[in-house]
């Protein structure tokens, strides 16, 4: 007896063979009430035939490597992932449905045997044999993915959720049902990109935790405090070091949150975050009020013209000064009282109302219709399996896997291997859309292939020729491509992302130079503090270089270049944003890469003016480079005033673009780019005196005093917030460090001082002194804008046994150079252990020694065995020992402790 299922199976195979032989073209799929599938397109060659629901339905999957298993599954129940292919005159049904009455189901419900299908039905063209372009656009195949209901009561079709006109509100993405395969469907008007900004210890990470909890981005069992602070150093120190991007779903909205650091050493992370956001949450500690970093953040937000949501945190504390802080915000920042939110991030109080404000106040990303793919890189890191991972913001278009892209700045081409979102772990997807913050992997293995602020465009739109690189303008295309997710059509004949591109008439022949397509550069801070890093063991020099390369990839403000020291061997001259930044880098090298390091004394960039006629040719060739331009450096006239020039450049000079260790924060270069320029009358801003200039952070590059006409040191605008009762202590400390008073502001019971301070004076322990004299209530921050002022500086040389230790040389002002030199000599005496020979430690300026200390040698009692005899025997032994000590003094080497520089210069992380 032949079973019914065998007959049905044979019938299915017969239908399949018959349909494959008559393969012609794909048509649209819809549901028809109470019946089955049919094709509504006219002229379908007999495809108006309807099939009863109790019939046998078969599923076809294209490109499958496991056809046998899927075939059996399709016969027995359902093939929910298959795509229906209708051919002229015949068609292949999609599902195998059982009799509703035999299954005991309600007649008004239609369910599948097997797992339930939750995705809409899609029909995709195959190998260019699709419908004409006009039919595929809008109401044709895959335009909206809309299905007519198939139930007797107008309900959803069997196994398919109700899908009513899911149009994408983002014309900039040209969204459609087929966007490359798997990107989540969401209107781009529902995307919100924002960051959380605040002074240190104001509760940014705690608020980010509440965001993750309330949006259910992280499961409760995996949740922990400071979840986004994934580095062990961040958890130990209780601070945020790196910006973190995370994607969250809130109702029908997509939140792209960027958690930023609060310490001013990592202010460059804040500036990069602002470049890719449309709004920001300004978080204020309810127990401390407005602090110094709050002022800098507010000014930076105004520069970027971002929407600001003021939020007062920690309202659950008894010491919260809510009314007082509100008054300060109204008077100082000119907020409206109704705009200020009160929350407790610890207990999630008021966070839901903050969500509503984010939705209503922060605008969605700018949308551009019919645009090609373009994105900007604002962060990156290294993965040992995938190589360099780029964190990008998509400015235009859609990006899918296996797409060829072009990097404008580096002029390199690569193929995208993986795209996805940060949730906060990497979650791959099929495509990313306009306005998204996502990651891409291009299988890059070299850390210097792509840099921060790089612009990525689709390779299809770049037309290369022998002389210049031009880009086809795609803003205007013939016809409306509303049904295409991203066709990427160019007049160069490049195929679309999905199938062959239909012929499209271009209404413009305008071509754009490639440089004009580059996005606005992300703010990247240049290092202001420099020091040398050496490995304790020479065998680890290569490992140290590899570690620095990977750290530079993850930290745009960090720079380094090779350097060699006679006493410490091969090393690297590195640039940082402050001593905390230096401390973090050193600790990460030790923990993540297992390399023990020695760090030299920190220094800053100095502008040196030398005598053009007096300097010899050899020294000129070593220091001078024509790439350096003094016009890019803001020099204060006469060493007074703030020296701020409207026309001075905010970027680095031409010579500092290589990321070398001696690059200044604003408009400088170093020994490699330490060039020269003559002061002239047409220099913008305050004109420096005429002469030969170069810039360096290496004190040993400064020649003898008879060659030098002047040394200029960097000054920065410093803001200090303190209670009124401590203001005299603050002013005394600032004047002691050669600060120039600018102005004072009063905010209720607090005072804000503005000083121009020498950068070298505030780097070492200045914040500790501020905290000490204000009993912990004071705070300090400084701007990255640098002004150079001429100062009476002296080069201090440290000698050990008549040998100059280059790594210990430093510059000091004439008011305190003797005090600093004597202090270093005394500390060296305490740190260096006694040797078999005499150790003499000296400090001097030029040929004049002004401080000296001696460490007596270890002596053996050579006369212990002399129990009598002539005195000449005893004297002979002592003279022989003394002669040996003198010989050892001339040829012996003093061992310096590896942690000498940290203790010597009191290098505490600010």
Curated annotation (Swiss-Prot):
Subcellular location(s) of the protein: Mitochondrion inner membrane
The protein's Enzyme Commission number: 3.6.5.-
Main location per the UniProt record: mitochondrion
Any one biological process term the GO annotation gives: positive regulation of translation
Keywords per UniProt: GTP-binding, Hydrolase, Membrane, Mitochondrion, Mitochondrion inner membrane, Nucleotide-binding, Protein biosynthesis
Broad class of enzyme this protein falls into: hydrolase
Binding site for GTP: 198-205, 259-263, 313-316
MF-aspect GO terms: GTP binding; GTPase activity; ribosome binding
Gene Ontology CC annotation, any one: mitochondrial matrix
Annotated membrane topology: Peripheral membrane protein
Reaction catalysed by this enzyme: GTP + H2O = GDP + phosphate + H(+)
Keyword Transmembrane helix set for record: no
Region (Disordered): 126-188, 639-683
Ranges of Low complexity composition bias in the record: 646-667
Domain of life: Eukaryota
Function (record text): Promotes mitochondrial protein synthesis. May act as a fidelity factor of the translation reaction, by catalyzing a one-codon backward translocation of tRNAs on improperly translocated ribosomes. Binds to mitochondrial ribosomes in a GTP-dependent manner.
Family: Belongs to the TRAFAC class translation factor GTPase superfamily. Classic translation factor GTPase family. LepA subfamily.
Note: This protein may be expected to contain an N-terminal transit peptide but none has been predicted.
The protein's name in its UniProt record: Translation factor GUF1 homolog, mitochondrial
């Amino acid at each position: 007896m032949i079973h019914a299922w065998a007959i049905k199976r044979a019938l299915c195979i017969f239908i399949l063979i018959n349909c494959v032989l008559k393969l012609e073209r794909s048509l649209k799929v819809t549901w028809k009430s109470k019946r089955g599938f049919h094709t509504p397109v006219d002229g379908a060659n007999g495809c108006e035939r309807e099939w009863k629901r109790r019939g046998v339905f078969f599923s076809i999957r294209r490109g499958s490597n496991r056809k046998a298993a899927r075939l059996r599954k399709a016969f027995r129940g359902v093939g929910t992932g298959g795509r229906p292919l209708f051919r002229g005159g015949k068609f292949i049904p999609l599902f195998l449905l059982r009799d509703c009455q035999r299954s005991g189901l309600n007649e008004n419900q239609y369910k599948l045997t097997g797992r339930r299908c939750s995705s809409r039905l899609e029909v995709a063209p195959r190998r260019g044999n699709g419908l004409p372009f006009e039919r595929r656009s809008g109401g044709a195949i895959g335009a909206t993915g809309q299905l007519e209901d198939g139930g007797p009561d107008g309900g959803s079709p069997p196994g398919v959720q109700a899908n009513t006109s899911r149009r994408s509100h983002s014309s900039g993405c040209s969204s459609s049902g087929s966007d490359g395969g798997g990107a989540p469907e969401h209107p781009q008007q529902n995307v919100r990109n924002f960051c959380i900004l605040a002074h240190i210890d104001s509760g940014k990470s705690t608020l980010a935790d509440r965001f993750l909890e309330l949006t259910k981005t992280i499961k409760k069992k995996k949740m922990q405090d400071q979840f986004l602070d994934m580095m062990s150093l961040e958890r130990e120190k209780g601070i945020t070091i790196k910006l973190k991007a995370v994607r969250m779903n809130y109702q029908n909205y997509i939140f792209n949150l960027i958690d930023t650091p609060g310490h001013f050493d990592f202010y460059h992370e804040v500036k990069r975050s602002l470049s890719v956001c449309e709004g920001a949450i300004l978080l204020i500690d309810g127990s401390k009020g407005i602090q110094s970093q709050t002022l800098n953040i507010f000014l930076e937000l105004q520069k970027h013209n971002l929407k600001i949501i003021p939020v007062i945190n920690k309202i659950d504390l008894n010491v919260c000064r809510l009314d007082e802080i509100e008054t300060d915000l109204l008077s100082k920042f000119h907020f409206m009282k109704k705009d200020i939110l009160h929350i407790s991030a610890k207990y999630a109080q008021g966070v839901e109302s903050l969500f509503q404000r984010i939705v209503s106040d922060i605008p969605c990303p700018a949308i551009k219709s019919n645009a090609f793919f373009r994105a900007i890189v604002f962060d990156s890191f290294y993965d040992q399996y995938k190589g360099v991972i780029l964190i990008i913001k998509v400015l235009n278009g859609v990006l899918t896997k296996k797409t060829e892209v072009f990097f404008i700045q580096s002029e390199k081409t690569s193929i995208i291997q993986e795209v996805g979102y940060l949730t906060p772990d990497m979650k791959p997807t099929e495509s990313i859309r306009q306005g998204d913050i996502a990651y891409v992997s291009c299988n890059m293995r070299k850390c210097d292939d792509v840099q921060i602020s790089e612009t990525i465009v689709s390779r299809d739109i770049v037309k290369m020729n022998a002389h210049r690189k031009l880009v086809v303008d795609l803003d205007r295309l013939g016809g409306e491509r509303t049904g295409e997710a991203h066709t990427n059509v160019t007049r160069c004949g490049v195929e679309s992302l999905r199938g062959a591109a239909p012929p499209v008439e271009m209404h413009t022949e305008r071509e754009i130079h490639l440089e004009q397509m580059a996005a606005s550069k992300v703010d990247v801070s240049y290092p202001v503090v420099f020091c040398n890093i050496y490995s304790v063991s020479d065998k680890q020099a290569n490992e140290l270089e590899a570690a620095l390369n990977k750290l530079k990839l993850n930290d745009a403000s960090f720079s380094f270049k090779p350097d060699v020291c006679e006493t410490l061997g091969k090393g690297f001259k590195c640039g940082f944003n402050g001593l905390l930044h230096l401390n973090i880098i050193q600790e990460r090298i030790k923990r993540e890469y297992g390399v023990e390091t020695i760090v030299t004394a920190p220094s800053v960039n100095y502008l040196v003016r030398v005598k053009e006629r007096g300097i010899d040719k050899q020294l000129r060739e070593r220091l001078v480079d024509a790439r350096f331009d003094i016009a890019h450096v803001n020099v204060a006239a006469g060493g007074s005033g703030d020296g701020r020039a409207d026309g001075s450049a905010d970027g680095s000079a031409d010579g500092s673009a290589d990321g070398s260790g001696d690059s200044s924060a604003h408009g400088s270069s170093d020994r490699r780019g330490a060039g020269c320029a003559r002061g002239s009358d047409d220099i913008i801003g305050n004109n420096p005196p005429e002469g030969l200039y170069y810039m360096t952070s290496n004190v040993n590059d400064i020649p003898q005093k008879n060659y030098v006409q002047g040394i200029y040191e960097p000054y920065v605008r410093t803001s200090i917030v303190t209670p009124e009762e401590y203001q005299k202590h603050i002013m005394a400390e600032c004047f002691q460090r050669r600060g120039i008073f600018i102005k004072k502001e009063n905010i209720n019971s607090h005072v804000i001082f503005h000083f121009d301070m020498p950068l070298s004076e505030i780097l070492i322990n200045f914040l500790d002194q501020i905290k000490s004299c204000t009993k912990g209530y004071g705070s300090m921050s400084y701007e990255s804008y640098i002004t150079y002022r001429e100062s009476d500086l002296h080069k201090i040389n440290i000698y050990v046994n008549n040998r100059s230790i280059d790594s210990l040389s430093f510059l000091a002002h004439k008011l305190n150079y003797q005090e600093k030199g004597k202090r270093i000599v005394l500390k060296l005496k305490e740190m260096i252990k006694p040797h078999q020979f005499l150790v003499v430690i000296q400090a001097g300026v030029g040929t004049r020694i002004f401080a000296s200390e001696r460490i007596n040698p270890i002596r053996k009692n050579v006369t212990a065995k002399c129990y009598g005899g002539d005195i000449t025997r005893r004297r002979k032994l002592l003279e022989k020992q003394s002669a040996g000590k003198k010989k050892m003094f001339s040829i012996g080497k003093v061992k310096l402790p590896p942690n000498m520089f940290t203790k010597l210069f009191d290098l505490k992380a600010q």
